[in-house]
């Protein structure tokens, strides 16, 4: 049963509804919510084996059940502003984005700007065949691959934007497993800082049910 809950859609949604109803949010929930409201690029990087679309359904549920109407309006406005600033899509699309229903705008953002990495899933294994060897047995490797892939996505969008500024990139990562926290810190210091020297990395260590903020950069 535990393994089914780790992979199947219905138990995941049921668990999420239970947590929402009982306000059982993790230490980084407000930071996650803030990132969505500001329409930032976001990644969910988990050892779960669900399909990525299950996680998207979960994020939509969080928005529907935990955001106020005012927070939703601010989020929609920020989504529109971010796409207009980036010039990622043509003017016709941008005009349609400004005139569409709020739910459709949020859904587009959740498809385009939010990445869902379920590192124990078949989807993940198929997407990163050349880089992994049974990542389901090694979530550490899977999470490292996901982090690197997400950073590449962010940088590609920045390079395409009207005014790329690589000195203002901040990457935050939240983790509640101490062993994984240490592994990701080590990975950033030994590899990612050399590849991306201008990125400001922030690790939120939630391993003791409270948040310890760790900053890693070359500044």
Task: Please tell me what each predicted stretch does.
Residues 9-12, 72, 147, 151, ...:
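Short amphipathic alpha-helical segments that mediate assembly, nucleic-acid/protein binding
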């Amino acid at each position: 049963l535990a393994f089914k809950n780790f992979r199947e859609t219905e138990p995941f949604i049921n668990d999420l509804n239970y947590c929402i109803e009982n306000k059982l949010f993790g230490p980084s929930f407000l930071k996650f919510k803030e990132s969505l409201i500001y329409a930032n690029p976001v990644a969910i990087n988990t050892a779960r084996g669900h399909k990525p679309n299950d996680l998207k359904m979960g994020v939509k549920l969080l928005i529907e059940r935990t955001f106020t109407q005012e927070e939703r309006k601010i989020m929609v406005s920020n989504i529109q502003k971010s796409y207009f600033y980036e010039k990622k899509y043509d003017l016709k699309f941008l005009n349609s984005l400004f005139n569409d229903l709020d739910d459709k705008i949020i859904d587009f953002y959740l498809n385009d700007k939010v990445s869902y990495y379920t590192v124990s899933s078949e989807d993940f294994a198929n997407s990163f065949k050349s880089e992994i060897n049974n990542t389901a047995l090694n979530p550490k490797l899977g999470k490292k691959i996901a982090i690197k892939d997400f950073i590449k996505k962010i940088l590609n969008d920045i390079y395409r934007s009207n005014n790329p500024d690589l000195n203002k990139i901040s990457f935050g990562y939240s983790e509640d497993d101490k062993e994984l926290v240490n592994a990701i810190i080590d990975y950033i210091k030994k590899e990612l800082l050399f590849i991306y020297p201008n990125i400001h990395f922030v690790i939120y260590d939630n391993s003791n049910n409270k948040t310890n903020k760790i900053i890693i950069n070359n500044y």
